[in-house]
UniProtKB/Swiss-Prot annotation:
Binding positions (a divalent metal cation): D16, E17, D108
Organism: Escherichia coli O127:H6 (strain E2348/69 / EPEC)
Protein name: Ribonuclease HII
PANTHER family: RIBONUCLEASE H2 SUBUNIT A, RIBONUCLEASE HII
Example GO BP: DNA replication, removal of RNA primer
A Gene Ontology molecular function term of the record: RNA binding
Cofactor comment text: Manganese or magnesium. Binds 1 divalent metal ion per monomer in the absence of substrate. May bind a second metal ion after substrate binding.
Entry-linked CDD domains: RNase_HII_bacteria_HII_like
Lineage: Bacteria, Pseudomonadati, Pseudomonadota, Gammaproteobacteria, Enterobacterales
Amino acid sequence: MIEFVYPHTQLVAGVDEVGRGPLVGAVVTAAVILDPARPIAGLNDSKKLSEKRRLALCEEIKEKALSWSLGRAEPHEIDELNILHATMLAMQRAVAGLHIAPEYVLIDGNRCPKLPMPSMAVVKGDSRVPEISAASILAKVTRDAEMAALDIVFPQYGFAQHKGYPTAFHLEKLAEHGATEHHRRSFGPVKRALGLAS
C-alpha cells in the first residue's frame, strides 16, 4: 500500500460512512479530528477489527480526539435523493457538526461532498489514514448499535446479525413479513417485497 502523504495543514478531519449497502436504516457517517499529542494505537479499518476492539477504540477516540461528530441520512432521504447523494449529505452533516472547523478534510472513497474547506478523497483511506480509520470505527459502532436496537423491535428480521444487509435470511424474512417503516423503499429487494417493482 502506498503511504499516504498528508496535506500541509494542522487540523485535518477524516470522514467515513457505514451503511450504503443495507436495505434498512440510516447511512451513518463520522468526522474526526485526532489530537497529535494523544495518539491512539491500533487504528485500522473498522471492518478488520473485532467488535470488542471496535467498542474499546470507539470510547478512546471519543475521549482523545480534538473533535468528533456523527452525521446521518435517514431511509426516506435515501429514497428521495438516492444512496450516493444521501451519503454525501450525511458526510456534510458530520463535518458541520465538528465543534472545531477543520482546515482540510480527507474522505474515504473516490468522491467528496461539497464542503466549505478544501477536501480530498482517499481510496482505501480507512486503512491508510488514521483520521478516516477513527471515523470508520465511530460510524460502524453507532450503526451496529442502531441495528441491535431495531432487532429488539423487529426480532423476526435478524437485524442484529446481518445489520440490514441483503443476506439470504434477510431477503427470506422480507418476503415473509414485508417491509418495516425503516426499510429503504427505493432498493430493489424492498420494492419487490412491497410489490412495487415493475
